[in-house]
Amino acid sequence: MGPRGRGGSRGGSFRGGGSRGRGRGRGRGGVNRFGKRPRFDSARVEDKEKESEEESLSEAEEDSEVPESESSDESVAEEAPTRPYMALLRSLSKGSGIKRRKLDHEPNNSEESGEDDSSESSADEDAPDDVCGDVDLVDEPEEDHDEIMEQERSDDEDEKDLTDSFNSHFASPDEVEVAERIKSITNHEWVSKRLPSKSARTVLTLPKQKDASDNASGPVPVTNPATLILKPKLKESITSQRPQLDASEQALAAPLFQYYDTLYCQRTVANGHNLRRLVCLHALNHIFKTRDRVIKNSAKLAKESADPDLEFRDQGFTRPKVLMLLPTRNSCAKMIEMMCSLTETDQQENRKRFDDSYVTREKQKFSNDKPTDFRDLFEGNADDMFRLGVKFTRKTIKFFSQFYNSDILLASPLGLRMAMGSTEEKNLDHDFLSSIEIVIMDQADAILMQNWEHVEHIFEHLNRQPKEAHGADFSRIRSWYLDGQSKNYRQTVILSSFNNPDLSEVMRVHCHNWQGKIRIQPDYQGVIQQLGVKVKQTFSRFDAQTIIADPDARFEYFIKAVVPSLTKRVKDSCGTLVFIPSYMDFVRVRNWFATSPAAQSLSFGVISEHTEVSETSRARSHFVTGRQKVLLYTERCHHFWRHQLRGVRRVIFYGLPDNPVFYKEIAGGCLGRSEQDMTLEPGEGSVRAMFSKYDVMKLERVVGTPRVGKMLHEKGDTFDFV
């Protein structure tokens, strides 16, 4: 059956969601389209006394939490190539008028959203939480650009500042330099350089330039918010809230406010709040400057209407300018709260509806053994299917605005992909992503545990030329939009607790910012000395010729070099936990244990993100009592549940986890728990980890930066640590 997660008071939240190749599931009130997942009877159990089994079963169930919702995914077909832009202009020349446009699959006739910026509509207050099974449903007409600007006015009269990164990057860039850089980007010509930094490894990557100096210094350092060029209202707010920036904020602020693509790999629970404040400040500043520039230029055009040569290029195809990709509704609520605190806006339209849909006021019921990062991620409403449009006017914030009327789009990857529709349903729509100028992905390490395919799909559809006009005034659209170069001006900011090949690939394939890219990540001390118990740790390197051949080489090494040590002394194999990061590898190993004659002497059980709670409790019980000597356990299951496994005497890492905290929890936590239960003598536990040269990022975080080079290049392939 589909992936499961917590429900109940979390507002239908669900976690997990299959392997990287499968999607996450439905939202509140949804249904499983595909029915139950076929069961694979994979366990092999040895006979034991029933009494001991029941006793251990009750112990295992104490740590289980029953999910109340299940999820499945809709696969979305790829879009056909877009038509040439000149054909688009011809098709739009007839005029489109005002359209009623929805980004949902079902109509909602019971709710209408008003445009009064000072109050909530009665329809919004009276609408049920689960209208048509979709709490994020919006049904309102798409506004024309001119109509939008007639309702608003600039909040100050600041003039153009040539030192302002907003002007130098978007409004008035050096066209010759930008053209040269874009040409280099098109030819995949980049130059990388490591910048001096005390707290992190900072790598600057710039498009190659003929006359560029090798002494590129990177972004100008930012020590406090007072040095930033911000809208006055935002500057007053941030200087009162945060007059000085700490080291982590300074590292991010410099590339962030100077519009570099940024991969920041030092996000923690401790600094997450401050980093969230910075990205919200940057997003709001960008939106307000864009809005005020358009309003001022519109006023000038109205005043000088007799001048036919007067022209202002200050808009995109559509209104949304910022996209925030977030893992859960609760993380979205934290972003919204931060924006409200920075804007200090009292008038918030549809606020009650937002609180009802995104904020869980009931006290969380986490067991005492859940770690801090788990609580931070899954507290509140942990539903991972949502999308929200937010519109800002001079005095009002409107939640649940229609996407084409919004300034900021906040969504989970699954929620946004569902909003984009599919070619199968003939409702594919991604025009609202055509003019995104800033993408912010927060808690990317958590999004990696969802369906990364959705993230790739979204990035592939960013900054494409739209299929419809959406009321745009083409005489006001910036030239680089019309030339199909908007992706070269878009800034992408990714915040994660660690780097990962998928994150690096997004930066390599989808980030074409002419300003350049910056990667910030720390040097690691490693966690092998932080287990809290004395245990022998053996790291075994195997050879894989290519990254494509790595899964096969890993499997062959496992069954030929690791499993024989278990089958030769079956009695000593009791309490063996096999940790498998990839679900595809998990299926392969599970099937081999179930069908291979070489494994017939080994009883085994399985726990994955797809395993039902009753089966999980049974597997844990059999493992504790010894009826199942080997337990196969996946990384994503541990991410979503953090099971406190008992009876572990030996840990085998089929692959190292992305998150180094998991290594410490599995190796140190499980073996330490066995010593506390006096089922394992101190110092008798063991850990064996398999790795190849393609695991360099994972290995560095586990063993430490100083050791990783030697372990990858030395002649020996076995490394022991005590």
From Swiss-Prot:
Q: Where in the cell is it found?
A: Nucleus, Nucleolus
Residue ranges annotated as compositionally biased, kind Acidic residues, are: 52-77, 112-161
Q: Name one Pfam family in it.
A: UTP25_NTPase-like
Per UniProt, which keywords does this protein have? Nucleus, Ribonucleoprotein, Ribosome biogenesis, rRNA processing
Compositionally biased residues, Gly residues: 1-20
InterPro entries xref list: P-loop_NTPase, UTP25, UTP25_C, UTP25_NTPase-like
GO cellular component, as recorded: nucleolus; nucleus; small-subunit processome
Q: Which GO terms describe its biological process?
A: maturation of SSU-rRNA from tricistronic rRNA transcript (SSU-rRNA, 5.8S rRNA, LSU-rRNA)
Q: Does the keyword rRNA processing apply?
A: yes
Job description of the protein: DEAD-box RNA helicase-like protein required for pre-18S rRNA processing, specifically at sites A0, A1, and A2.
| PANTHER family given in the database record | ORF PROTEIN-RELATED, U3 SMALL NUCLEOLAR RNA-ASSOCIATED PROTEIN 25 HOMOLOG
Family listed = Belongs to the UTP25 family.
The name of this protein is: U3 small nucleolar RNA-associated protein 25
Organism encoding this protein:
Pyricularia oryzae (strain 70-15 / ATCC MYA-4617 / FGSC 8958)
Gene responsible for this protein: UTP25
